């Protein structure tokens, strides 16, 4: 098996910088669209054989150094008692607004409530055995709360922030419950065979550093501390957190995910020996090849040869990116960083 990704997570020497892409199994790939055309998004998430097929596609097509389970961060929320639909974005029919709503949420039994996720992990370990490691993942408690309280995507998640400030007891009770669920969900993925875990906090960066420290950090800290992490690296990605890396680092984990709004070299100076993942602007993949190569080289140069770099985009790959651009980017990373 290609162990570059896991080695880099632990800061070990590698022959070339490993690379994978957030949302690498997705709409930009014709092979993915062929599978997706036969089912709904939720059916794809809930059918282990199909989830396995689309998870493996980018490994074979792009030549990336890790696979990430095909699923959605909101998958474990539905069995907590919230009706979820994708039309096309995520929508909860009845958002959480009161203490009674929080108390009505249950902690799912992962083996019986989301067996399709765990079955996909087991299938993937067999499928990928001679290829690359498998990353399991979940949403951070704060980002999950954003969707559960708002009921759908939002630019400012005002309903969640209103709860945070005006109903702190309800907010705390909700966050505690989500954190407990999240811990059990990610530990179930680890038990099923996930070789690394990524925690996505897509909306954590919309808070001030002080609010992040008060309202988010304790829960992410508790989540990471509660994972069965023996030989399982944890990647913590908070989009938009470039101004508060010192605080985010306190959450724990082994690898800090970085978006493209931060200079990777300066981030490494702040983070010390902690491994990092990132951080190319996803829209660079629309550029001519010479610009893609220039930007890949810039990120590698900012790293200055330090161990513990996993190359990635600063957020998910966009659906309209030509696949050949992603293939070229992966090749650039390997070629330019080869020892």
From Swiss-Prot:
Lineage, top-rank taxon, reads Bacteria
Question: Assembly state and interactors?
Answer: Homodimer.
The entry's localization annotation reads:
Cytoplasm
- Purpose of the protein: Catalyzes the decarboxylation of four acetate groups of uroporphyrinogen-III to yield coproporphyrinogen-III.
Which positions are annotated as binding substrate? 23-27, 72, 147, 202, 315
What is the protein name given in its UniProt record?
Answer: Uroporphyrinogen decarboxylase
**Protein family:** Belongs to the uroporphyrinogen decarboxylase family.
Q: Does the keyword Transferase apply?
A: no
- Sorted alphabetically, which Pfam families does this protein's record hold? URO-D
Quick one: where is this thing mainly located?
cytoplasm
Name the UniProt key words of this record, in alphabetical order. Cytoplasm, Decarboxylase, Lyase, Porphyrin biosynthesis
């Amino acid at each position: 098996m290609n162990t570059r990704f896991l080695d880099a997570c632990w800061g070990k020497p590698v022959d070339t910088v490993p690379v994978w892409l957030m949302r690498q199994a997705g709409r930009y790939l014709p092979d993915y669209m062929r599978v997706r055309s036969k089912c709904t998004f939720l059916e794809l998430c809930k059918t282990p054989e199909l989830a396995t097929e689309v998870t493996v596609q980018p490994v074979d097509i792009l030549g990336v150094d890790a696979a990430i389970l095909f699923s959605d961060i909101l998958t474990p929320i539905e069995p907590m008692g919230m009706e979820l639909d994708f039309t096309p974005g995520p929508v909860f029919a009845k958002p959480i607004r009161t203490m009674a709503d929080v108390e009505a949420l249950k902690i799912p039994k992962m083996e019986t409530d989301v067996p399709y996720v765990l079955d996909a992990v087991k299938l993937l370990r067999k499928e990928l055995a001679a290829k690359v490691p498998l990353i399991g993942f979940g949403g951070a408690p704060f980002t999950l709360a954003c969707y559960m309280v708002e009921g759908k995507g939002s630019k400012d998640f005002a309903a969640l922030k209103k709860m945070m400030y005006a109903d702190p007891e309800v907010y705390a009770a909700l966050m505690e419950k989500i954190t407990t669920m999240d811990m059990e969900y990610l530990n179930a993925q680890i038990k099923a065979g996930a070789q690394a875990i990524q925690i996505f906090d897509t909306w954590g960066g919309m808070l001030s550093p002080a609010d992040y420290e008060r309202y988010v950090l304790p829960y992410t800290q508790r989540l990471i501390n509660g994972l069965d992490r023996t030989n399982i690296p944890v990647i913590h990605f908070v989009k938009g957190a470039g101004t508060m890396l010192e605080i985010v680092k306190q959450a724990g984990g082994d690898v800090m995910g970085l978006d493209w709004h931060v200079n990777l070299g300066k981030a490494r100076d702040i983070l010390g020996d902690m491994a990092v993942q990132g951080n190319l602007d996803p829209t660079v993949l629309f550029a001519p090849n010479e610009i893609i190569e220039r930007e890949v080289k810039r990120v590698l140069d900012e790293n200055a040869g330090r161990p513990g770099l996993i190359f990635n985009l600063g957020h998910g790959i966009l659906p309209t990116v030509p696949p050949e651009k992603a293939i070229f980017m992966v090749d650039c990373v390997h070629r330019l960083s080869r020892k």
